[in-house]
From Swiss-Prot:
Classification lineage: Eukaryota, Amoebozoa, Evosea, Eumycetozoa, Dictyostelia
Cellular component terms per the entry's GO annotation: cytosol; nucleus; proteasome regulatory particle, lid subcomplex
Keyword Chaperone: no
Family: Belongs to the proteasome subunit S11 family.
Pfam families: PCI (PF01399), PSD13_N (PF22037)
GO molecular function, one term: structural molecule activity
InterPro entries from the UniProt entry: PCI_dom, PSD13_N, PSMD13, WH_DNA-bd_sf
Annotated PCI domain residues: 176-347
SMART domains in the record: PINT
Alphabetical list of SUPFAM superfamilies matching this protein: Winged helix' DNA-binding domain
Protein name in UniProt: 26S proteasome non-ATPase regulatory subunit 13
Domain of life: Eukaryota
Keywords (A to Z) from UniProt: Proteasome
Function text: Acts as a regulatory subunit of the 26S proteasome which is involved in the ATP-dependent degradation of ubiquitinated proteins.
Length: 385
């Protein structure tokens, strides 16, 4: 491969892609004037041009031109440019190229973490078991770099959480997949994700929410516009499932199971976890009961819980012990009289019905406070008299 000095290469490049001559001339002028920020923007534009991509000239563009002044560029911008270059290689070459860039930008948090995320992604895409382990190690390193750091560029967070999402998907780790996928969605614009990918991600999120060991909050997902990708599709039933679980509505859950039994029978993630699903919705039913019960009346009988959860009375203590061990509620069980005294319920994102319920309870509390105030005022008047 021939090598050129920067300006010589630009002249050579104009012969390869004559349609881009004007852009290349502008780049030449900006380079000669050492306007590095403006040059960065021009490079970002030209490297996505179909003509340059078709000629597979990006690596030569980097080697013969960009590398001459790469230390003048903002490190994160350099990494983004190099990632565009790396996409023209196969997975292994792409990873090795970004590994060399990673060492050059190691002192810059944003740039370094972005390279780590890309390297982890290439390890994941290789499909080789050993490199899957390398993916994990690289993600752990990136996570360490993120600890205690705020205010990094959005692309740094979105790239990290996207690769983490894909990794946990590959490892069938539902709870971690759910957590990382929601973080990814919080840092990326939905319109940048294709409709097909949105539908796939929404489906996998719903399944992960339902079967994930430690997932007992569905409000984040229900409120996320990603679920619109399932509306009108064959997986639309999952939205109704989530909403039933979110409020612990066992009757609605049973109805949906019956209504959609044919398609549910094809969902092995659901059918293989039916016992866990029934336990989860029972716990969520308990949480809903506790949430709707005023805090000064949260001494709840086993029989009332059995009625709400549709469980036999003999299974209630086990349900309560499970909920306490998961730190979803705090309190104490009085086995003698079969009552639990709940002192705390895990916070969660509320739907409109739950918000209305809380509003009603606040209104009731306000009236009680007003009544108490009036009684105090009346007693004060009597004392003064």
């Amino acid at each position: 491969m021939a090598t050129y000095k920067p300006l010589e290469y630009l002249e050579h490049l104009k012969k390869i892609v004559p349609d881009l001559s004007d852009q290349i001339n502008n780049i030449k002028d900006t380079y000669e004037n050492k306007l590095w920020h403006q040059l960065t923007k021009q490079i970002e534009m030209i490297i996505i041009s179909p003509q340059l991509l078709e000629k597979k000239e990006l690596f030569n563009f980097y080697t013969n031109f960009i590398r001459d002044f790469e230390n003048k560029l903002r490190p994160l911008s350099l990494v983004e440019i190099c990632i565009a270059v790396a996409r023209q290689f196969d997975t292994d070459e792409s990873r090795k190229f970004i590994e060399t860039i990673s060492q050059k930008v190691k002192k810059d948090k944003s740039a370094y973490i972005l390279t780590l995320s890309y390297i982890a992604n290439m390890n994941l895409r290789s499909g080789v078991a050993e490199q899957l382990q390398d993916c994990k190690k690289t993600l752990e390193l990136a996570k360490e770099e993120l600890q205690g750091v705020t205010g990094l560029d959005t692309i740094v967070y979105s790239s990290f959480y996207r690769v983490s999402t894909d990794y946990h998907m590959a490892k069938s780790q539902a709870s971690e997949f759910y957590k990382n996928a929601l973080m990814y969605l919080s840092y990326c614009k939905l319109e940048t994700i294709s409709q097909e990918e949105q539908a796939s991600l929404a489906y996998n999120l719903c399944i992960a929410a339902l079967v994930g060991e430690n997932v007992y909050g569905f409000g984040d997902l229900i409120a996320n516009p990603i679920l619109k990708a399932l509306e009108g599709s064959q997986h639309n039933w999952l939205i109704a499932f989530l909403k039933a679980f979110n409020i612990g509505d066992i009757q609605q859950f049973e109805g949906l199971m019956s209504q959609h039994r044919d398609i549910i029978s094809t969902q092995t993630a659901i059918t293989n976890n039916m016992q866990k699903l029934r336990q989860k919705i029972s716990i969520l039913s308990l949480l809903e009961l506790a949430f709707r019960t005023p805090s000064d009346k949260r001494s709840i009988s086993f029989s009332k819980i059995a009625q709400a959860t549709k469980l036999p009375l003999g299974e209630i203590e086990h349900l309560l012990m499970k909920s306490l061990s998961l730190n979803l509620i705090k309190g104490s069980i009085d086995q003698t009289v079969e009552i639990i005294h709940i002192t705390w319920v895990t916070p969660r994102i509320l739907d409109l019905n739950q918000i209305n319920s809380m509003n009603n309870r606040i209104a009731e509390w306000t009236e009680k406070a007003k009544t108490s105030l009036r009684l105090v005022e009346d007693d004060t008047v009597d004392l003064v008299a």
